[in-house]
Amino acid sequence: MTFNHFDFEYIDAHTHFFPPQIFNAIWKYFEQTDEKGNIRGWPINYKLAPEDLVQFLKSQNVKAYTTYNYAHKEGVAEFINEWVKDFCIKHKNAIPFGCVWPEDQNRLEYV
């Protein structure tokens, strides 16, 4: 019996979703180049806006997906968590992840 990718439905447990401005900052960071022009981090294969990423996942038979995110510096976790909350209200198949920056003074309030 032969199967193909579209014979199945998937849960993607490792998808990153961030507010667009944070996505852009992360992509810029990971694609920094050295003095020879080589990428020091790694290339980002799917540079898609959150709504486009949702559509791409749907096109691949992904029925549920995480918002696997992280705070990369002080003071952004609360903003990311609020964005994720709103995103998941709109996208019922999204499995929300929250994040925390250990040194945020208000971390207990936003967790």
What are these regions (language model features)?
Residues 1-111:
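Helix-coil boundary/capping segments in enzymes
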